[in-house]
C-alpha cells in the first residue's frame, strides 16, 4: 500500500472543492478597501480605536458573502475565493506603484480588472501620508535613515501590513462564546471611575469591543439567512439538510458557546476568518487544535451525532477554506517569500499541563485530514517528546513521506525548558503552540510579534565588519568600525569585529522596530484580536500596546529574547563565510 492509499482519499465533493480553490485565479479585490475608506471618512472625529471598530463593522455589514455549493462551512474573506483584499490603512504606496504590474510578476501573480484599478485610484488620495507606513517612517530617528535607505534591514513586512503571529484563545471562545466576552466588558465598563484619567481610554476601548462583538454576531447572522435562502431553493434533499443545519449553526456561533463539533468548527472558522478581515497580518494560527476541539469531537462521537468520517470531511473542508485566505505583498517582498504564504499554523500532539502525552483520537483525525488535502495551508506542526504515542509518531512519518513538507516537528524537550528558563509559567510553557513558519508562543496569552520582525542582511553586516564599518554595497558607513580585514592579524580579530558590529546593528534594528510598533499602537489597533487575547480586556488596552504591566511571568523578557533570535535566523551564510575566512587565515 502506498502512502496516499494509507490515509484514504478525499470525499468526491471535497476533492472537487479542493480543485476549484486550487484552480481559482487570484484577483486584487477592492471591496474591503472601499468600505474601510468610507468608515475612516465617516468617523474622523472618533478616537482611532473606535474608528477601527466601526471600520470592521462596516466591512462585515457591507461585504459580499456567498456559500460554496460544496462547502460545509460558511464564511469568505473576499468577493471570490483566493482574491486578495487591499488594506489601505497600512499602505497604498506599493499598490498604486504596481497597479499595472501585478499580472506581470515572475511569482505571486495577481490579476486585476480595470474597474478595480479605478476604485483604488479613487480612494488612494485619502490615504496619502495617512497610513501606518507614512506614520511609521515619520517616527524613525535620523540615525537609522541609512539602514532604511540601503535596505540592510528588511522592515517592509511591518510597515506595509498588520502583525499577527499569534493564536487567540480559541478554547475560551468555544466555551464562553463572544457573549461571555460581552458580559465581562459590560461589567468592567460599568465599574469605571472616570475621575481616573485612564478610565477615559478604557471606556472607548470597551465601547469598541462591544461594537465588534455585535458586528461579528450580525455577520454570522447574514450567513444564517443566506443558508436558509439557499436551502429553500435546494432540490437535493441531503444538501438541503446541510444548508438548514448550517443556517442554524451560524445563527448561534460564535456569539453563543459551541455545543457540538460542527458548531465548534464553524465558530473557529468565523474567528480565524474575521481576524484576517480586520488585519492582514499573517501567521494567524489555530493554536493547539486537537486539544480544545477534542471535547466536542468525543461528545458527538459518544452520542452518535457524528462519525469519524463525518469529522474527517468537515476538517478537510476547513483546511480548504483556510487556503482561500490570501494576501498581496509588494513585488520586492515576494522575492523572499513567494508562494503567497499565510503561515496559518495548526498544532497537534505535545503534552498536557500535567506533563502527560496529549495525543488523542482527534490528533489522528487532524493528521489524516491534512494528509488527504495535501495543501500549502494550513501549516501543520506536531509537538513531539520522549513519551509521544509511537503509533501517532509513525503516522507523522508516513505523512512526511507524501512529500508536501508536513508536518513540521517541534521538540518539547528543547522548547519547554527554554520557555521556563526565560520566566514563562510552567503551565503556559507546556501549552505552547506554533504561530507561523517557525515561531512558537503561548496561545491566547501572547500579543503581537513576540518573536520580532527585523530581518538583518547578515552577509552585508559581515562584509561591513571586514571593511571598518563601511557597507561595501552602498559605500555608506553603518558602524563606527573595528578595522579592515586586510589589517587583522588573527581570526579572533575578525570575530571580535563581527561581534561588535552585530551588536551595533541589532541595536539600530530595535530602534526601527520600536518606531513602527509605536505607530502601530497609535494608528492601527486591532479591536477583535485584542478582545480575544488575554488579558487585553482586563487591562482595557489593545493588543498593540506593550504587555509589561499586565504580564507577571517575565514573558516580556522572553519576547525581547525571541526578537533577537528572529534576527539570528539568517546567520548560516555569514557563518559559512566566516569558516572559509578561518581557513584563509590558517593558510
PLM ranges: what are they?
Residues 2-206, 242-245, 249, 253-571, ...:
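Conserved catalytic cores of very large enzyme subunits
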Residues 207-219:
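Extended non-globular scaffold/tether segments
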Residues 230-241:
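A conserved hydrophobic secondary-structure block that centers on an alpha-helix together
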Residues 236, 556, 578:
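Short, conserved catalytic/metal-binding motifs centered on acidic residues
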Residues 225, 291-295, 576:
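A generic alpha-helix surface/boundary motif
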Amino acid at each position: 500500500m502506498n502512502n496516499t492509499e494509507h490515509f484514504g482519499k478525499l470525499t468526491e465533493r471535497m476533492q472537487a472543492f479542493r480543485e476549484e480553490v486550487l484552480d481559482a485565479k487570484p484577483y486584487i479585490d477592492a471591496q474591503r478597501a472601499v468600505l474601510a475608506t468610507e468608515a475612516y471618512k465617516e468617523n474622523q472625529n472618533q478616537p482611532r480605536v473606535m474608528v477601527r471598530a466601526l471600520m470592521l463593522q462596516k466591512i462585515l455589514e457591507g461585504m459580499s458573502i456567498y456559500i460554496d455549493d460544496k462547502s460545509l462551512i460558511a464564511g469568505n474573506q473576499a468577493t471570490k475565493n483566493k482574491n486578495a483584499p487591499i488594506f489601505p490603512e497600512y499602505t497604498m504606496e506599493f499598490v498604486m506603484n504596481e497597479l499595472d504590474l501585478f499580472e506581470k510578476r515572475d511569482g505571486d501573480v495577481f490579476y486585476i480588472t480595470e474597474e478595480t484599478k479605478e476604485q483604488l485610484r479613487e480612494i488612494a488620495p485619502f490615504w496619502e501620508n495617512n497610513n501606518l507606513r507614512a506614520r511609521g517612517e515619520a517616527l524613525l530617528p535620523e540615525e537609522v535613515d541609512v539602514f532604511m535607505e540601503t535596505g540592510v534591514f528588511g522592515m517592509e513586512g511591518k510597515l506595509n501590513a498588520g502583525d499577527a503571529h499569534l493564536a487567540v484563545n480559541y478554547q475560551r471562545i468555544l466555551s464562553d462564546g463572544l457573549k461571555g466576552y460581552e458580559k465581562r466588558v459590560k461589567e468592567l465598563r460599568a465599574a469605571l471611575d472616570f475621575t481616573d484619567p485612564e478610565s477615559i481610554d478604557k471606556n472607548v476601548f470597551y465601547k469598541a469591543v462591544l461594537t465588534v462583538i455585535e458586528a461579528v454576531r450580525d455577520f454570522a447572522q447574514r450567513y444564517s439567512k443566506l443558508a436558509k435562502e439557499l436551502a429553500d431553493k435546494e432540490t437535493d434533499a441531503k444538501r438541503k439538510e446541510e444548508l438548514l443545519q448550517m443556517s442554524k449553526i451560524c445563527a448561534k456561533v460564535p456569539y453563543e458557546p459551541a455545543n457540538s463539533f460542527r458548531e465548534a468548527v464553524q465558530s473557529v472558522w468565523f474567528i480565524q476568518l474575521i481576524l484576517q478581515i480586520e488585519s492582514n497580518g499573517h501567521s494567524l494560527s489555530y493554536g493547539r487544535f486537537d486539544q480544545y476541539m477534542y471535547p466536542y469531537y468525543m461528545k458527538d462521537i459518544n452520542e452518535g451525532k457524528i462519525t469519524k468520517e463525518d469529522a474527517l470531511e468537515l476538517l478537510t473542508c476547513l483546511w480548504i477554506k483556510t487556503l482561500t485566505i490570501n494576501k498581496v505583498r509588494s513585488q520586492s517582498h515576494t522575492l523572499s517569500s513567494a508562494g503567497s504564504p499565510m503561515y496559518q499554523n495548526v498544532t497537534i500532539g505535545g503534552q498536557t499541563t500535567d506533563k502527560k502525552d496529549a495525543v488523542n483520537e482527534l490528533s489522528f483525525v487532524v493528521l489524516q485530514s491534512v494528509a488527504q488535502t495535501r495543501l500549502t495551508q494550513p501549516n501543520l506542526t506536531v509537538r513531539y517528546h520522549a513519551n509521544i504515542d509511537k503509533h501517532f509518531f509513525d503516522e507523522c512519518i508516513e505523512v512526511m513521506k507524501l512529500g508536501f513538507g508536513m508536518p513540521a516537528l517541534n521538540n518539547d524537550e528543547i522548547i519547554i525548558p527554554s520557555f521556563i528558563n526565560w520566566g514563562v509559567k510552567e503551565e503556559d510553557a507546556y501549552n505552547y503552540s506554533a504561530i507561523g513558519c517557525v515561531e512558537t508562543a503561548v496561545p491566547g496569552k501572547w500579543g503581537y510579534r513576540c518573536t520580532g520582525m527585523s530581518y538583518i542582511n547578515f552577509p552585508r553586516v559581515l562584509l561591513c565588519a571586514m571593511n571598518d564599518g563601511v557597507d561595501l554595497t552602498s559605500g555608506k558607513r553603518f558602524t563606527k568600525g573595528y578595522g579592515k580585514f586586510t589589517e587583522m592579524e588573527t581570526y579572533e580579530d575578525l570575530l571580535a569585529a563581527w561581534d561588535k558590529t552585530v551588536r551595533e546593528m541589532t541595536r539600530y534594528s530595535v530602534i526601527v522596530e520600536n518606531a513602527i510598533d509605536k505607530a502601530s499602537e497609535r494608528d492601527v489597533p486591532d479591536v477583535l484580536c485584542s478582545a480575544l487575547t488575554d488579558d487585553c480586556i482586563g487591562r482595557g488596552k489593545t493588543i498593540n500596546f506593550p504587555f509589561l504591566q499586565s504580564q507577571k511571568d517575565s514573558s516580556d523578557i522572553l519576547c525581547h529574547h525571541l526578537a533577537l533570535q528572529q534576527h539570528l535566523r539568517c546567520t548560516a551564510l555569514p557563518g559559512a563565510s566566516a569558516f572559509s575566512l578561518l581557513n584563509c587565515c590558517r593558510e
